[in-house]
């Protein structure tokens, strides 16, 4: 049975490649999806790759991943909640409520940026937190999930 990795991207990540390239790099979200597709293929994993600017959509997708997790069909979730990392109790509750293994991911090193970005509601519920590796962090997170 092939397990699935969900890669969920939060607000403004649809602007990758044009938004603050000095912080986030020049690769687009489509480039990130290709990177994730290749990483999953290396491990024989299926990929669900999504982005939304809406918190409720991210919650719904975590619930969807939770159903796969309950059926033993989920390798894990790579969650780049973007700004919702610092504000969303709803995402925290979704992760806790479903028990999905989550890697919290940030393209930039959030700890080297503004102080409001230093706090994560999700970190305590995540299996791992990765930041500062650029978009390559997505592939590294998938590599980690494949080992669990």
Curated annotation (Swiss-Prot):
This is 3-dehydroquinate dehydratase. The record marks 19 as: Transition state stabilizer. Pathway: Metabolic intermediate biosynthesis; chorismate biosynthesis; chorismate from D-erythrose 4-phosphate and phosphoenolpyruvate: step 3/7. Substrate binds at residues 80, 86, 93, 107-108, 117. It comes from the Bacteria. GO terms for molecular function: 3-dehydroquinate dehydratase activity. Belongs to the type-II 3-dehydroquinase family. The active site is at 24 (proton acceptor), 106 (proton donor). Pfam families: DHquinase_II. The keyword Amino-acid biosynthesis applies. GO terms for biological process: amino acid biosynthetic process; aromatic amino acid family biosynthetic process; chorismate biosynthetic process; quinate catabolic process. It comes from Acidovorax sp. (strain JS42). It catalyses: 3-dehydroquinate = 3-dehydroshikimate + H2O. Homododecamer. Keywords: Amino-acid biosynthesis, Aromatic amino acid biosynthesis, Lyase. PROSITE patterns: DEHYDROQUINASE_II (PS01029). Catalyzes a trans-dehydration via an enolate intermediate. Its EC number is 4.2.1.10.
